[in-house]
């Protein structure tokens, strides 16, 4: 983990990855997010914690849930929010991401929520940030998506309790190219998950050591037995073009979550998916919309998690 996330006193300065993040810091963020979520039940309030603070969502890749969630989170904390769109900005004229950051900093922006297609891009920007400026990684390449990992953990706590020591969690699908899977794996390890199972086609499983300590297999039905939670990953359709998946139909046959398959898992197993869902590919309609689905709960928890992160970094 990069040490630049923490200041000399061990306080969070940026949120770039969950890898190596101290357990105490992770728990503090989750506890605070839970408090915010519970306080907001039945009402949507606006606070003034970040009144007068400018936050910019700096996205170099498309996003719906993450960008909207951060925008709402910052607004509810009273921040002034700027939305940066790379397609209509000076980056089209050749301006670098670093220069964009420094120019916005000069205008008084203190918080940057950054999504970028390149691994390590957000950390590189953080090295250029001035004192008092905080960066949040909203997804870079295939390396990290820390707030998604946090909201997944918050959703698991809500569904299964705070003690993860006996949890059997299955991560299914395109793990190799998934920044969400990597963040979830780091968080689950830090929180002491009892057993982490990883399942998918061999062509979509990473070989860089990230799965060390996990139970890894390609037989989805076998991996489902007794599972407490299932994290279904989006099949990135471009992988078909690379020849890594023969067809959507075959993928669904082997790794799609159906009602019949779900019955193999533990009673009341929680079903998670980071979205966007390819219905009929990773998961059927009846499971995605069923009683065990936590998909919309994940979306709702995302706002609380991002409020907690913004408050911690900028409040």
Swiss-Prot record:
Designated gene of the protein: pyrB
GO process terms (BP): 'de novo' pyrimidine nucleobase biosynthetic process; 'de novo' UMP biosynthetic process; amino acid metabolic process
Binding positions for L-aspartate per the UniProt entry: 93, 179, 234
Enzyme Commission number(s) of this protein: 2.1.3.2
GO molecular function: amino acid binding; aspartate carbamoyltransferase activity
Matches recorded under PROSITE patterns: CARBAMOYLTRANSFERASE
Subunit structure: Heterododecamer (2C3:3R2) of six catalytic PyrB chains organized as two trimers (C3), and six regulatory PyrI chains organized as three dimers (R2).
Record family assignment: Belongs to the aspartate/ornithine carbamoyltransferase superfamily. ATCase family.
UniProt protein name: Aspartate carbamoyltransferase catalytic subunit
Positions of carbamoyl phosphate binding: 65-66, 115, 145, 148, 275-276
Organism from which the protein derives: Xanthomonas euvesicatoria pv. vesicatoria (strain 85-10) (Xanthomonas campestris pv. vesicatoria)
Pfam family name, one: OTCace_N
First-level EC class: transferase
Function: Catalyzes the condensation of carbamoyl phosphate and aspartate to form carbamoyl aspartate and inorganic phosphate, the committed step in the de novo pyrimidine nucleotide biosynthesis pathway.
Pathway the protein takes part in: Pyrimidine metabolism; UMP biosynthesis via de novo pathway; (S)-dihydroorotate from bicarbonate: step 2/3
Reactions the enzyme catalyzes: carbamoyl phosphate + L-aspartate = N-carbamoyl-L-aspartate + phosphate + H(+)
Superkingdom of the organism of origin: Bacteria
Protein keywords: Pyrimidine biosynthesis, Transferase
InterPro entries in the record: Asp/Orn_carbamoyltranf_P-bd, Asp/Orn_carbamoylTrfase, Asp/Orn_carbamoylTrfase_sf, Asp_carbamoyltransf, Asp_carbamoyltransf_Asp/Orn-bd
Cellular component terms per the entry's GO annotation: cytosol
């Amino acid at each position: 983990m990069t040490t630049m996330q923490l200041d000399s006193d061990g306080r969070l300065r940026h949120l770039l990855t969950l890898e190596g993040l101290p357990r105490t810091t992770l728990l503090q963020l989750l506890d605070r997010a839970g408090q915010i979520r519970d306080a907001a039940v039945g009402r949507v309030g606006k606070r003034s914690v970040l009144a007068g603070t400018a936050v910019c969502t700096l996205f170099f890749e498309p996003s719906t849930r993450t960008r909207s969630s951060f925008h709402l989170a910052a607004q509810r904390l009273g921040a002034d929010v700027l939305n940066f769109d790379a397609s209509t900005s000076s980056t089209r004229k050749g301006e670098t991401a670093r220069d964009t950051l420094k120019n916005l900093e000069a205008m008084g922006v203190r918080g940057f929520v950054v999504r970028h297609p390149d691994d390590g891009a957000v950390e590189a920007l953080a090295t250029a940030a001035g004192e008092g400026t905080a960066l949040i990684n909203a997804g870079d390449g295939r390396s990290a998506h820390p707030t998604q990992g946090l909201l997944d953990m918050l959703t698991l706590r809500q569904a299964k309790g705070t003690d993860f020591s006996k949890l059997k969690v299955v991560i299914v699908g395109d793990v190799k190219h998934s920044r969400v899977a990597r963040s979830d794996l780091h968080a689950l390890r830090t929180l002491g998950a009892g057993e982490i199972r990883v399942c998918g086609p061999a062509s979509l499983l990473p070989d860089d050591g990230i799965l060390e300590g996990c139970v890894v297999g390609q037989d989805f039905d076998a991996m489902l037995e007794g599972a407490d939670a299932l994290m279904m990953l989006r099949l990135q359709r471009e992988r078909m073009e690379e020849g890594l998946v023969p067809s959507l139909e075959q993928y669904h046959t082997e790794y799609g979550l159906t009602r019949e398959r779900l019955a193999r898992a533990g009673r009341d197993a929680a079903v998670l998916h980071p979205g966007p869902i390819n219905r009929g590919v990773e998961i059927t309609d009846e499971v995605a919309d069923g009683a065990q689905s936590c998909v919309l709960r994940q979306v709702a928890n995302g706002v609380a998690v991002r409020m907690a992160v913004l408050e911690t970094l900028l409040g």
